[in-house]
């Protein structure tokens, strides 16, 4: 019985998949990765190529960055956005199986051949631009909670800044939610599908070229400046990225303006909370808290 309160394992996931895939009883699996939200295993079974399974450890995600996110909805979103990627030429793994609505959500996917070589210059920028040029899908992303980008980003920024203050003891003047919402107005216009977590663990590559975008949990439908500001805070927005993205003067001006500042604060606060609370790392936490302080000084 798959209740909201139980913890799930790879064996649970395989049991569900047996209804759609032929999986031998002696199938072996090894944990590939796991994060705050999901577990990922490699499965080897007689008579078929190895494949990947991804599933939530528990239904409700509650932490200092996110409150009451439904991992079942996130899994369905992942399936839909992988399908959208395939339809529009964005590399992504092929979905092998996904249970019917109402069942425990486990995603079975092909294994994409990948290596650890660094990306070619501008590759991440080019792939990000390809994504941002697409007409967005008709989907309400879980991260947006059915609200406008400016509304949800403003609220989450203020909430996360309060957590940063509580956990670090570092205070100071914090912009109000209404002030941030006004500054963030541009992210409600000319919206596109944003991945919102384009770091090394969330894309696969081979010979320096991206072969698959994965993990769409943070996806939003908003103006690309929100994602560009996130990439600045991730340390991914290099000259090579900008060249590959072919950033325009207008986009650069928006990114360096008040909308970009508010977007950067949104991500900086999130990262500070991650390293203060969700994945504690005192050294990184100190760096991220200092970055939050630096950004706050730029608000009038």
Spell out what each predicted region is.
Residues 103-106, 209, 269:
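A generic structural signal for beta-strand entry/edge sites
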